[in-house]
Amino acid sequence: MAKSKFRPLHDRVVVRRVESESKTAGGIIIPDTAKEKPQEGEIIAVGSGARDEAGKLVPLDVKAGDRILFGKWSGTEVKLNGEDLLIMKESDIMGIIG
């Protein structure tokens, strides 16, 4: 992705979905109409973090380049620089892969 001028605020992250396999382990090809949207992605950009009760800035646990798992209905779909991306809160992320 070309460097975007978009920077998420607070505890939000920008995620690019990682495409799922188009073939099963047994070699069956899955048509596009039967595929579900992948729940795995790569973080493209992160916000500066959220503030705790005392007003102290708490940085995010994830960083650009991390591969993550997120919920099926997580985030808001947006199009930036012609690319379909998701913007979600860090709390929508279930975990980091690898």
Swiss-Prot record:
Gene3D superfamilies named among the record's database cross-references: GroES chaperonin (2.30.33.40)
Cellular location(s): Cytoplasm
SMART domains to which the protein is assigned, alphabetical: Cpn10 (SM00883)
An example Gene Ontology biological process: chaperone cofactor-dependent protein refolding
Keyword Mitochondrion attached: no
This protein's UniProt keywords: Chaperone, Cytoplasm, Plasmid
Primary localization: cytoplasm
Similarity annotation: Belongs to the GroES chaperonin family.
Protein's name in the database: Co-chaperonin GroES 5
